[in-house]
């Protein structure tokens, strides 16, 4: 009985604390049409203090969505266009020698912002990618002999283009694992595309106003962890994760030769957190199995290694996750 009272209290608190989500969504919907999945995943990354990798063909509003989110939240925003000639100093900053004062001064790079858009991250060499990914992990940057903390909230949203892979540097598996979510953006529906086409032909500038403060976001990042998760949901998450490592124990022996490595503990941590965030953005104080299923592909598709055999059979990590989710009993 006491547990039920607690859940009711949590639910009331979450409903109150998540009221800003509707404001944020309506502000983003002024500009972004028909990409609810992408907007939801950006909000999950923001609330979960995670970083997001967006993948999709050009022209699907990836950059626009990220830019709009930063405008709707009164925080600083910077964009880094990754190119083959980019240097780590172009991302994190460098030391400049002042001749008049005979000393070095620090010039901070674009990574010093609340929202950092890393556009076409797979176009820069590994050492540049590493500089950004280290900042993402450590939430700090070292320039010369000085270490600088990055401002909270700090969210990196990286984009990559799945086509036109010539001249690209694919992110190593260990680096990709640092992204909380990898979201694949699809084409809009025909009705949505009609609205997009009309809006662009009218050529009227839409002004996005800040509707949420940074302080409110930071409070929400703490409150989201209070969303209630039953032990049965925890077991459900762990069954999904362990099925990527030991499929034969879950009546999925046919998957064993297709998986070169399963999801790491980061997978279970991020799946649980993303499910809590999904419940939060839906104004609910407890996690249900549908929350887990709504985020499982975004959390795990970049955390499972597929074998040469899987590639030969034209199987992707998404196909493997689909089989696992269909097999694991829902609590």
Task: Please name every model-derived segment.
Residues 14-60, 242:
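Pre-Walker A (pre-P-loop) alpha-helix and adjacent loop at the N terminus of AAA/AAA+ ATPase modules
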Residues 10-18, 31, 168, 182-254, ...:
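Conserved C-terminal "switch" segment of AAA+ ATPases
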Residues 98-103, 120, 124, 128, ...:
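Canonical AAA+ ATPase core
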Residues 1-14, 247-331:
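C-terminal engagement/docking regions of AAA+ P-loop ATPases
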Residues 56, 119-120, 131:
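Walker B catalytic acidic pair
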Residues 41-44, 97-117, 146:
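Conserved alpha-helical scaffold flanking the Walker A/P-loop in AAA+ ATPase domains
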Residues 57, 91, 159:
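P-loop (Walker A) phosphate-binding loop of NTP-binding proteins
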Residues 46-83:
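Walker A/P-loop
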């Amino acid at each position: 009985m006491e547990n039920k009272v607690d859940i009711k209290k949590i639910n009331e608190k979450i409903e109150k604390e998540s009221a800003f989500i509707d404001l944020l969504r309506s502000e983003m919907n002024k500009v972004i049409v028909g990409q609810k999945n992408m907007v939801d995943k950006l909000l999950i990354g923001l609330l979960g203090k995670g970083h997001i990798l967006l993948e999709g063909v050009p022209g699907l509003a990836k950059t626009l969505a990220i830019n709009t989110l930063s405008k709707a939240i009164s925080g600083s925003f910077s964009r880094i266009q990754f190119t083959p000639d980019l240097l780590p100093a172009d991302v994190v900053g460098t030391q400049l020698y002042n001749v008049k004062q005979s000393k070095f001064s620090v010039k901070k790079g674009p990574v010093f912002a609340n929202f950092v858009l890393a556009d076409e991250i797979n176009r820069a060499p590994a050492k540049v990618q590493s500089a950004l990914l280290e900042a993402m992990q450590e939430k700090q940057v070292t320039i010369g002999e000085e270490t600088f903390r990055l401002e909270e909230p700090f969210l990196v949203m990286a984009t990559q283009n799945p086509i036109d892979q010539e001249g690209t540097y694919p992110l190593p598996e260990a680096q990709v694992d640092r992204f909380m979510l990898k979201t694949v953006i699809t084409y809009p529906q025909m009705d949505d595309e009609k609205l997009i086409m009309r809006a662009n032909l009218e050529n009227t500038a839409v002004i996005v106003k800040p509707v949420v403060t940074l302080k409110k976001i930071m409070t929400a990042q703490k409150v989201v962890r209070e969303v209630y998760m039953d032990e049965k949901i925890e077991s459900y998450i762990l069954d999904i994760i362990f099925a990527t490592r030991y499929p034969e124990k879950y009546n999925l022996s046919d998957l064993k030769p297709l998986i070169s490595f399963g999801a790491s503990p980061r997978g279970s941590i991020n799946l649980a957190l993303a499910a809590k965030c999904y419940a939060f953005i839906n104004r609910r104080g407890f996690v249900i199995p549908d929350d887990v299923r709504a985020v499982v592909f975004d959390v795990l598709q970049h955390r499972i290694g597929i074998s040469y055999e899987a590639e030969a059979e034209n199987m992707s990590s998404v196909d493997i996750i689909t089989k696992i989710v269909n097999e694991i009993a829902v609590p």
